[in-house]
Curated annotation (Swiss-Prot):
Name assigned to this protein: Assembly-complementing factor 4
Phosphoserine: residues carrying this PTM: 44, 71, 74, 78, 165, 288
Additional record remark: Present with 1140 molecules/cell in log phase SD medium.
UniProt superkingdom: Eukaryota
Compositional bias (Acidic residues): 287-298
Keywords (A to Z) from UniProt: Phosphoprotein
Length: 309
């Protein structure tokens, strides 16, 4: 043997490359493999299929209660159970109340619907009554009902309170005027009008009068004010209720008009004074279009308004 020749102790098992349908080939080789399994292992260790590794997975299981802590032993076991019973009872009562309130709301809605249906049927019954009764009798009964409702409304406590408050509101200014008059005018006779000689003495001052101050009674108001106050008081008592309301509104409107007139007068006074914006030079004056005396003539097809500024 030459030196270049390689010495092989064991033959190397090499497989030829072949492109074949391995699926069909594998199915054909399965019975042959079963037969060879009975025989002892072949010489080549590569023929044996490798073993699949076992996968260690966590088993799926549902949680369960522990029996050890299910019934703990303690001294406070009895009050806890009683508290739980009370809580359950309270919850049951609350639920019952809620259910009853819901039923009450439903019943109220049904009642309103029934009332509306009953009102819809009323005109038909009224027409039947009109056919059976005389129209004059029906009108008389209807007017009696209306009058009775008016009387009931006017005699209601809320209406009486409202009328009383409104009467007090309108009677306050009259009472104030009368109280002022009674305070300024005590129960005494009015002084007679002075004569001509007394007037002259009052006009011509003297030294004696200057040296000794006179403490005379206060001046009396004219008789016209008393008459006007008395007449307004009697007129306010005699006028009806609605007329007094209208008079009050008219008085308020008059006061608003007077206030507006005062504002307009003040504005008119302010308008007389103003700050001059221009300095008074000739170029500050604005020329109007009427001052332009020059007339433009048309130039062919061009209109005249294009030449104007």
């Amino acid at each position: 043997m030459s030196e270049d020749q390689r010495v092989i102790s064991q033959p190397i098992e090499l497989h030829k490359l072949s492109i074949v349908d391995k699926h069909s080939q594998g199915q054909q080789q399965q019975p042959h493999q079963k037969q060879h399994e009975v025989q002892p292992e072949s010489k080549s260790p590569r023929v044996t299929t490798p073993l699949k590794p076992k996968r260690l997975a966590i088993p799926i299981s549902s949680p369960q209660r522990s029996t050890t802590n299910q019934s703990p032993v303690s001294d406070h076991a009895s009050p806890i159970s009683t508290d739980q019973d009370l809580i359950y009872k309270l919850a049951a009562k609350h639920r019952e109340i809620n259910e009853l309130s819901f039923k009450l709301e439903v019943a109220q809605k049904e009642l309103k619907q029934l009332e509306l249906q009953f009102k819809d049927t009323l005109p038909r019954n009224g027409q039947q009554k009109l056919g059976n009764q005389n129209p004059s009798e029906y009108l008389s009964t209807f007017t009696k009902r209306i009058q009775q409702t008016f009387v009931d409304v006017n005699n209601s406590p809320n209406m009486l309170k409202g009328k009383k408050s409104i009467n007090d509101f309108f009677s306050k200014p009259n009472n104030n005027v009368n109280s002022n008059i009674n305070n300024t005018l005590p129960n005494r006779k009015p002084n007679p009008p002075p004569n001509r000689s007394q007037r002259m003495q009052n006009i011509a001052p003297s030294r004696s009068s200057e040296s000794t101050p006179t403490s005379g009674p206060p001046l009396l108001p004219p008789r016209n004010t008393m008459k006007n106050a008395n007449t307004t008081a009697t007129a306010g008592e005699n006028t009806p209720f609605l007329q007094r309301i209208l008079n009050k509104f008219n008085q308020m409107n008059m006061e608003e008009d007077e206030f507006d007139d005062l504002l307009e007068k003040r504005k008119s006074k302010k308008d007389h004074y103003y700050i001059k914006e221009n300095l008074g030079y000739e170029y500050d004056e604005v020329r109007s279009e009427d001052e332009d005396d020059e007339e433009f003539e048309p130039m062919g097809d061009i209109p005249v308004h294009l030449f104007k500024r």
